[in-house]
């Protein structure tokens, strides 16, 4: 897209986050439209302050306005937690290592691999790079326990490091595996599991079978733009269109 990169999001030591462009007229145009509601004060001809909490919404609105932003604001590391791959009798395959490196270089994205190609291993490798607390969102409890078993087999994590947040348990640990169903459950019109996203300073969020990601979960986590986020799937075709 020829307009991509003509507006950029950058971290700023004083303002937290800024939207910048080498073309002041673009910023003026955006300030007067719907995007303007998400913008702060004009710092100079080429720069507008932005509230960090609006990072996700602003990127969506810029895309709708025809000005897709290049996001150079980076990611926070989150709460540190040691983890390494335990390559005892096995090793990352070349394509798994390539997928992990490609994700890490961008900091956020989707890895598409066919069934049986080891998407969970790619997730574990990303966790080993992050060295931080990780929230893993899965389709159901069975998938969550498969993730737990695979992480215990493939990494240096212990059972005490991994928590299950499901209909049966509400454990929040350095590595927490939660089901989409429990995250989207409402009580008195409110998503009770919102506390899960704020319960720790997550450094990495992994979405298993991201093509099944419920819209409410997407909306909840779209505000977590400063966190590294990895989607894993065998297809990019969503079942709900």
Q: Could you tell me what each predicted segment is?
A:
Residues 133-140:
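Conserved RecA-like ASCE P-loop NTPase motor core of nucleic-acid helicases/translocases
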Residues 1-78:
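Extended alpha-helical interface modules used as scaffolds for assembling large macromolecular complexes
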Residues 166-204, 215-220:
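Conserved helix/coil segment N-terminal to the catalytic DExD/H
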Residues 54-56, 141-143, 170, 181-184, ...:
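Conserved nucleotide-binding/hydrolysis micro-motifs of P-loop NTPases
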Residues 203-204, 209-241:
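Post-DEXD/H (motif II) to motif III coupling segment of the RecA-like Helicase ATP-binding lobe
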Residues 77-112:
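Conserved pre-motif I regulatory segment
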Residues 105-130:
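Walker A/P-loop
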Residues 141-169:
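Conserved helix-turn-beta segment of the N-terminal RecA-like "Helicase ATP-binding" lobe
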């Amino acid at each position: 897209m020829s307009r991509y990169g003509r507006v950029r999001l950058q971290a700023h030591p004083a303002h937290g986050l800024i939207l910048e462009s080498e073309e002041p007229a673009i910023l003026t145009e955006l300030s007067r439209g719907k995007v303007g509601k998400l913008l702060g004060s004009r710092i100079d001809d080429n720069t507008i302050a932005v509230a960090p909490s609006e990072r996700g919404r602003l990127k969506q609105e810029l895309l709708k306005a025809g000005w897709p932003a290049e996001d150079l604001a980076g990611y926070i590391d989150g709460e540190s937690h040691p983890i390494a791959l335990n390559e005892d009798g096995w090793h990352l395959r070349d394509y798994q290592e390539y997928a992990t490196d490609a994700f890490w270089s961008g900091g956020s994205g989707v890895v598409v691999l066919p069934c049986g190609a080891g998407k969970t291993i790619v997730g574990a490798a990303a966790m080993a790079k992050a060295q931080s607390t990780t929230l893993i969102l899965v389709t159901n409890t069975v998938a969550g326990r498969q993730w737990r078993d695979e992480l215990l087999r493939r990494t240096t994590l212990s059972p005490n490091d991994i928590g299950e947040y499901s209909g049966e348990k509400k454990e929040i640990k350095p590595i927490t595996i939660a089901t989409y169903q429990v995250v989207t459950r409402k009580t008195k019109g409110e998503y009770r599991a919102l506390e899960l996203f704020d319960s720790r300073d997550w450094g990495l969020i992994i979405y298993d079978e991201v093509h099944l990601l419920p819209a409410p979960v997407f909306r909840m986590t779209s505000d977590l733009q400063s966190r590294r986020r990895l989607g894993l799937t065998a297809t990019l075709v969503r079942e709900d269109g």
